Amino acid sequence: MADITVAELAKEIGTPVDRLVTQLADSGVNKSATDAISQDEKEALLGHLKKQHGDESEAKPNKLTLNRKTKSTLTMGHGSKAKSVNVEVRKKRTYVKRSEVEDEKLAEEAAKAEAEAAILAEADAKAKAEAAAKEAENEKGVAAAKAEVEAERKAEAKIEAAAKAKIAAVEKAKNVEQAPEKVAETEEAKKLRLAQEKETLAKVEAEAAAAAEAAKKLAEENEGRWKEQEAERKAKEKEVVHLTSSVYAQEAEDKSDSADESGRRRKKKKAPDRNARGRNSGRGKGKTLSSPQSLKHGFTKPVETKLQDIRIGETISVAELANKMSKKGAEVVKAMFKLGAMATINQVIDQETAALVAEDMGFEVVLVKENALEEAVLADRNDTGEEITRAPVVTIMGHVDHGKTSLLDHIREAKVADGEAGGITQHIGAYHVETGHGMITFLDTPGHAAFTAMRSRGAKATDIVVIVVAADDGVMPQTIEAIQHAQASEAPIIIAVNKMDKESADPDRVKSELSQHGVLSEEWGGEVQFCHVSAKTGLGIDELLDSILLQSEVLELTAVVDKMANGVVVESKLDKGRGPVATVLVQEGTLKQGDIVLCGLEYGRVRAMRDENGKTIQSAGPSIPVEIIGLSGVPISGDEATVVKDEKKAREVALFRQGKFRDVKLARQQKAKLENMFASMAEGDISEVNVVIKSDVQGSLEAISDSLLKLSTDEVKVKIIGSGVGAITETDATLAAASNAIVVGFNVRADASARKVIESENIDLRYYSVIYALIEEVKQAMSGMLAPEFKQEIIGLAQVRDVFKSPKIGAIAGCMVTEGVIKRSAPIRVLRENVVIYEGELESLRRFKDDVQEVRNGTECGIGVKNYNDVRVGDQIEVFETIEIKRSL
């Protein structure tokens, strides 16, 4: 199409001339109405209009070209003849959109179609214009010419619209055709890949099935032979005969046997005597000369490393483990670090950790039970026999002023058999009574303290608990404590309501108060028997004994008589004339004079036996308390007493238990004290604060308990192990020792027996008279168990004025201290333009050639930074300290 003027173009597209001139100027084409416009200028105008209407697809670049230039220097040759060559590498890379190459073909087709449409439109327009001009001049004039121009404009608009529709159809067809091709290609590739995977899987399954079939046939053929070989190997391993039961003695015995075997082999291979006489032993002609032989080394290098089995006990130190493996201690410590366990060379580790380390280093481990001897000794007993009914063991508990002692005295006076002279021996804590329905064994008040110790050790020496409550006084805090002990031992309870002869007796009040603590009488629908008795008049004593025997029948208590005895220590003491004396309650079997008894940490032969009346007896059956003499030491109350066969083995077991008890005692020294609670928390030993509280009145006790429980958080918890009203007793101290607790006394004090236990067990005991002080100290202890926070505080700043070189240290910074103090032991930072460039520590700090520990503000000094020499003039050296900030609740 020939170039036309701006006015003609405005007339063709039907827009005012002024508006078209403005749009051309906005697109960068400055034209007037009479100027001609080219095709490129029309395209520029069209792009500008599209951009204004939001179509920026053609405005965005489709290609991006990057030019890169790299310069480097290459040194050729060595020494003085070396030459440097400058190398410059230029790279040019063009990035094209993914769709551009594909769209070029479509763009070309669209351009061709548009050109053809334009040519046709131009020819048609020319023909129509010429015809219209002629007709206008000849026939109709100006009106006909205007109509023809309008028709020409409409025709061009239709042709342009048809061209655009064709371009859009081509683009749509391209998008529709591309998708099926890609989908078809993807489906074909997927089918091919699945077929290959299926074929490979079938081959692998066929090979695996063939291998399994071959292995099965081989196992069936050799099954019998393998079982015989395994049985022979196990039999050989078990053929280890030792004369002693000690592990160390067994190892020494094995070494001695191996030395003897090697000595016998050397004797067999010994050379003949050089002085022996014979036909060929003389000198001269009869002597035959042997041909010279090449010397052979006596040591043959092993083909592969032979690792020995090592025996590991329940506990072993790192040094002992290294010695058994013939390794250096540092190697074992390094191996433990790799496994995530940190230990020193003298630290004792458990059996599992030692086995893991040994197996990791390539050794085979044989785990040894150190208590194997103890189990063997206890198993070597005749435990078979006929079971018969035994007497119940009854513990009488209660407040000291509620008539417990009077009740025991009345039972003793009424039921001791005729002809038995003398009264009950006061220092023996157990005795038995014969009734018309059977025998009953009682544990008196000293047995109460032992009962707490038994409960902490898990021994169940008591069958029935009788709790004495005064009818005129009601339930006291120590009565509640007795109920707690009885419920913890899971023993049935019988309530004896004493002092019923008094006018102020109110048994219903006792029942009501006990029901608040989970003790319901049978009359109120519970399971606890209530007996109304009077120790003064003897009222209800027979009913109480009948209730005890009835409860024992329900329990169906049985024991074997004809076997070696075992029992529990009720009480023990050291007598000046007789030595260690222990009161033992026989639970099973028959204890005889001359038996060898293993009693906790002690052992010995029973040299004499006495009953509760002080009479010498020869034997004692089940549920009979006896006093034995002949032990090696004073046993602990609650320990188990067992009769064994061999005194030598009993001694070994006792010594082993003593060593184990020593380790446990050392471990128990880490008590939950207020001063070292944070240290214990860091070791992971304590996760909660155990407290035993004793107060003067019940109101204060409730207030303290509620306040302490409210202090508990997610990290630290307060656990009240026991609480009560009254003085701190021996029972409280024993309970605190067993549960690792702190004993808190509020306006109360500990009695003499409790102070002895507290001193021996190293229990933390605190007295308070103000509740706020108590809560504050416990709060501080809990805050100490929280993990601390750390904060860095700047203590000094020095400005570098000059830098010197030292042959020993390196760069020395001559500084002026501008703020605070510079300490040699504190860490430092080097700042350059207020940016930290190095963090480390000082290597030297000098003032006038003298080494100093600190330099204060306004003083010059020389500073050497360790492992850093890039100190420059103008740098700042900052000295700081790390401060630990304790967290609080």
From Swiss-Prot:
Which of this chain's residues are annotated to bind GTP?
Answer: 398-405, 444-448, 498-501
Region entry G5, spans: 534-536
The record places domain tr-type G at 389-558
Keyword Protein biosynthesis assigned to the entry: answer is yes
| Positions of the UniProt region annotated as Disordered | 47-85, 206-302
* Cellular compartments per GO CC: cytosol
Alphabetical UniProt keywords: Cytoplasm, GTP-binding, Initiation factor, Nucleotide-binding, Protein biosynthesis
Q: Specify the superkingdom.
A: Bacteria
Query: Which stretches of sequence are listed as region G2?
Result: 423-427
Composition bias of kind Basic and acidic residues appears in 52-61, 214-241, 252-263
Cellular localization per UniProt: Cytoplasm
Question: What Pfam families would the database entry show?
Answer: EF-G_D2, GTP_EFTU, GTP_EFTU_D2, IF-2, IF2_assoc, IF2_N
Q: Which family does it belong to?
A: Belongs to the TRAFAC class translation factor GTPase superfamily. Classic translation factor GTPase family. IF-2 subfamily.
Q: Which HAMAP family match?
A: IF_2_B
Tell me the function of this protein: One of the essential components for the initiation of protein synthesis. Protects formylmethionyl-tRNA from spontaneous hydrolysis and promotes its binding to the 30S ribosomal subunits. Also involved in the hydrolysis of GTP during the formation of the 70S ribosomal complex.
Q: What is this protein called?
A: Translation initiation factor IF-2
